[in-house]
Amino acid sequence: MKIFVQKLRPNAELPLLQTKQAAGYDIHACLDSKLVLEPGNVGLVPTGLSFAIPQEFHFEIRPRSGFSTKNRILIPNSPGTIDSDYRGELMIPLLNLGDSSFIIEHGMRIAQLLIRKTWYADWELVSEFADRTERGANGFGSTGH
């Protein structure tokens, strides 16, 4: 699939698969200088990239597992959704859950990008559902787990 990408900064790096069968493309920080993320704070990290996502798709932005577990750095709105009609710079929000400052440097792999199919619903309003299920309207904790 071809997806058009604009480099908004000359030092921006394209998304990269680390293995042939990886689902997520690594996204890199695009910085002119180091960014210090203090404990408990969220910072928006620029990628220097803008995308023209085909209409029937969207991107999901997720944490990289090693980056998150080793550094206690998370994406607070994970998974983040990038809609096909957005043309601005891809910015990655990072939350520092650690006890000390974390330094983000240019080129650091900070997130994963997944390409997802977008489904559009044709909502039909009904007064009741035609089928009944064993669970019914039982919600939180109703299955005992």
Swiss-Prot record:
Signal peptide boundaries: none
Example of a GO biological process term: dUMP biosynthetic process
EC number assigned by the record: 3.6.1.23
Protein name: Deoxyuridine 5'-triphosphate nucleotidohydrolase
Binding site for substrate: R64, S65, G66, N77, T81, I82, D83, M91
Pfam families listed in its UniProt record: dUTPase
Alphabetic keyword roster: Hydrolase, Magnesium, Metal-binding, Nucleotide metabolism
Matches recorded under HAMAP family: dUTPase_bact
GO molecular function, one term: dUTP diphosphatase activity
SUPFAM superfamilies: dUTPase-like (SSF51283)
Family assignment from sequence similarity: Belongs to the dUTPase family.
Catalytic activity, reaction form: dUTP + H2O = dUMP + diphosphate + H(+)
